[in-house]
Curated annotation (Swiss-Prot):
GO-annotated molecular function: ATP binding; ATP-dependent protein folding chaperone; unfolded protein binding
Highest taxon listed in the record's lineage: Bacteria
Record's function text: Acts as a chaperone.
Induction / repression: By stress conditions e.g. heat shock.
Biased composition (Low complexity): 589-606
Gene transcribed to yield this protein: dnaK
Modified residue annotations for Phosphothreonine: 175
Organism, as annotated: Clostridium perfringens (strain SM101 / Type A)
InterPro entries, per database record: ATPase_NBD, Chaperone_DnaK, Heat_shock_70_CS, HSP70_C_sf, HSP70_peptide-bd_sf, Hsp_70_fam
CDD domains, alphabetized: ASKHA_NBD_HSP70_DnaK-like
Name the UniProt record assigns to this protein: Chaperone protein DnaK
Amino acid sequence: MSKIIGIDLGTTNSCVAVMEGGEPVVITNSEGARTTPSVVSFQANGERLVGQVAKRQAITNPEKTIMSIKRHMGTDYKVNIDGKDYTPQEISAMILQKLKADAEAYLGEKVTEAVITVPAYFNDAERQATKDAGRIAGLDVKRIINEPTAASLAYGLDKMDSAHKILVYDLGGGTFDVSILDLGDGVFEVVSTNGDARLGGDDFDQRIIDYIAEDFKAQNGIDLRQDKMALQRLKEAAEKAKIELSSSTQTLINLPFITADATGPKHIDMTLTRAKFNELTHDLVERTIDIMKEALKSGNVSLNDIDKVILVGGSTRIPAVQEAVKNFTGKEPSKGVNPDECVAMGAAIQAGVLTGDVKDVLLLDVTPLTLGIETLGGVATPLIERNTTIPARKSQIFSTAADNQTSVEIHVVQGERQMAADNKTLGRFTLSGIAPAPRGIPQIEVAFDIDANGIVKVSATDKATGKEANITITASTNLSDAEIDKAVKEAEQFAEEDKKRKEAIEVKNNAEQIVYQTEKTLNELGDKVSAEEKSEIEAKIEEVKKVKDGDDIEAIKKAMEDLTQAFYKISEKLYQQNGGAQGEGFDPNNMGGANAGTGAANSNDDNVVDADFEVQDDK
């Protein structure tokens, strides 16, 4: 049975893990890192970059570099690149494709199934959008699970014998969640959850950006936030400063030539202290404490009941966050799990449960928001209360609001407000064919089904006639099957184009290498090669040089093959002249470097890649 991978699709960074030998293992990416920046960029030549390479060029290509797309999941937001609109699902799919490819390279087999995590406070539209992104990336998403729940799995896998009540504080790049769980005897049961899908490390960065920009504006009269390239430099500087302030009490922000005016170039050279950073972000930290209070209250849990506090998400490395959590809970947060990796590890454990690799683990999650319908007067009538264990099914009998009413519109809402208009609309559908009768007489059963992924289905049945209507909630911001299929085809086409582009680069690199090595060896051999032979080789070299920068890969391969064969004849002759001993330290098999010769021309060695090395000045 093929592996099911676990993916933490994060706002700023993503991570992928898999079960091996009964333990979750984080998979390193092609750059050798254990997490991958959730960044996508589009190049002028049509190439797409994902991850660290995309983040690295963001300053020089800010308009075509997309970050924090997760914040727009489940909305109608679109990114326009070169006249083409991309949905958040499509951009997220590009990140998932990168993670999928890294997992396949690590496992040595094709990966088609995944468990993907989402913030606990993601609504139905955001969860659907995540599933769509997986589908576009070529992944069958077997389960969507909440990030704090996944983290608790990673924390509790080796602690299943004793009962614990744990509080998971998950502050990521773009979202914040708190979950309280009962853990014991292999059962992970979520007691309550609360959160804010628009609160995270990005907001802490933004406070630093605004502070720097306002200070610069006061001194120079220029708002750097209006300059996209300058703003991108500010973003990188803010993130770097935030990270440095986790281990230092102050940091230097130095941005030379940030902009210019009539008086000349302008620079930023300022010091930011941890105390000032704490002052700038105090209300954000307090907001997380308020959400913790709400989670405890809705779960009817006191702080004395909590045995352990787990910190999840890179933003929990901020000292003020750690201090606030410690002061509020009265407990030292557990450092037993890596905040950047534990969510992906938990997803891998859930994948292991689905494949049978992990035994005796039962995950009981909850729905984060109340589900209901609009009734007379615009009231939101709840059917499934928040923090109900899922999967769940609830039904209730309703009736008509007018005499002889033959149809009813069911307006499905999600949220905690009393009035339907104040909550999020998940969908509307109509039940027709109701037998005419005075108001209040017809009996219409409305049933809500919510599956283990948190995806909602609603049905309405006229008890008298048996007529039924139903809807699987797919918000207007989600993609239709046709749109998903189109995006899947585009993603597959791009993957094939990317493969061809990579092959072309490798062949051209090999051509450069074989030309260099051949010319070098010819010079070293000197008079040992006749003028006629030298002329023939030089002609072959010129042929490779002529075609190597073109687009005809087959022509480059043929020219390389011709050069290799011609030089091989000379090397064989020299070999015989030296009585079977390799002369002058010359090895014809190595003349083109590790990847040259006919093998390179045919790209037989998939394990060998050329690398570009960038020389940087010492800072």
